[in-house]
UniProtKB/Swiss-Prot annotation:
Interacts with DVL1. Interacts with RBPJ. Zn(2+) 1 binds at residues 257, 260, 263, 290. Induction: Up-regulated by BMP4. This is CXXC-type zinc finger protein 5. A motif (Nuclear localization signal) lies at residues 251-256. Expressed in neural stem cells (at protein level). Expressed in the dorsal telencephalon. Residues 1-95 are annotated as: Disordered.
């Protein structure tokens, strides 16, 4: 019995010891689990602090890393915003960062307003420059127009002066009314009738009482025919006056033209018969005689006055 009781006691002691050991073991395990829980609770904060920040990529997809090692723990602005932070410490840090972000945003807005104002000034300056350039171009065009008008007035004045001089020359060469039987009105009527009958090659001479046939055109120049002195008789007898002018021009003493090679010679040959008989014949050197003077008078001059008032041919 004693042995059985001792065995039971031993069994009870062992059981109690096992219970105590199990309880102590369970208590140690519980303490271990509590410590591991605290370590696990503190570990994520340290790991979160030591963990590298998330990769930042710009629009091109390039990773933007901080330039300095002290900036490795930097966080984006959204991390510190009121929407992203929920904890107490996180809320405090988020509040400070939010204040900084607000200050930065205010400075950026101020800079943006300054830039906008500068851009507005820059935009306004080109418009003002464009307006000033347009005004300058208009002024230059106006000055050019005034210059052209002044030049036109000057040319008109010169033309008027030339016409006045031509009228004076015509009045000096034409006979007076007292000496001639007819005056300027009769000659104007004749010139107008001729202009109506035939088209003249001198359209600008219609304003003056001059018939183009009065002008003798030679290579040496243009001369007035001698028939201008008999202008009075042309109104009454135009054909007779024409014939008289042709005869008188044929009898007129001719002069050297001064254009041909013999006229340009300045030295006599002293060998021809004219040079040998100079004292008796009073003839010019044969090598210096004008080519026009060698021709006959009838061939030298064409018809001076044409009945239709048309232009006459050049002398050949």
């Amino acid at each position: 019995m004693s042995s059985l009781g001792g065995g039971s006691q031993d069994a009870g002691g062992s059981s109690s010891s096992s219970n105590t050991s199990s309880s102590s073991g369970s208590g140690q395990k519980a303490g271990g689990t509590d410590k591991s829980a605290t370590v696990a609770a503190t570990a994520p904060a340290s790991v979160a602090d030591d963990a590298p920040p998330p990769e930042r990529r710009n629009k091109s997809g390039i990773i933007s890393e901080p330039l300095n090692k002290s900036l490795r723990r930097s966080r984006p602005l959204s991390h510190y915003s009121s929407f992203g932070s929920s904890g107490g410490a996180g809320s405090m840090m988020g509040g400070e960062s939010a204040d900084k972000a607000a200050a930065a945003a205010a400075s950026l807005l101020a800079n943006g307003h300054d830039l906008a104002a500068a851009m507005a000034v820059d935009k306004s300056n080109p418009t003002s420059k464009h307006k000033s350039g347009a005004v300058a171009s208009l002024l230059s065009k106006a000055e050019r127009a005034t210059e052209l008008a002044a030049e036109g007035q000057l040319t008109l004045q010169q033309f008027a002066q030339s016409t006045e001089m031509l009228k004076r020359v015509v009045q000096e060469h034409l006979p007076l009314m007292s000496e001639a039987g007819a005056g300027l009105p009769d000659m104007e009527a004749v010139a107008g009738a001729e202009a109506l009958n035939g088209q003249s090659d001198f359209p600008y001479l219609g304003a003056f009482p001059i018939n183009p046939g009065l002008f003798i055109m030679t290579p040496a120049g243009v001369f007035l025919a001698e028939s201008a002195l008999h202008m009075a008789g042309l109104a009454e007898y135009p054909m007779q006056g024409e014939l008289a002018s042709a005869i008188s021009s044929g009898k007129k003493k001719r002069k050297r033209c001064g254009m041909c090679a013999p006229c340009r010679r300045r030295i006599n040959c002293e060998q021809c018969s004219s040079c040998r008989n100079r004292k008796t014949g009073h003839q010019i050197c044969k090598f210096r005689k004008c080519e026009e003077l060698k021709k006959k008078p009838s061939a030298a001059l064409e018809k001076v006055m044409l009945p239709s008032g048309a232009a006459f041919r050049w002398f050949q």
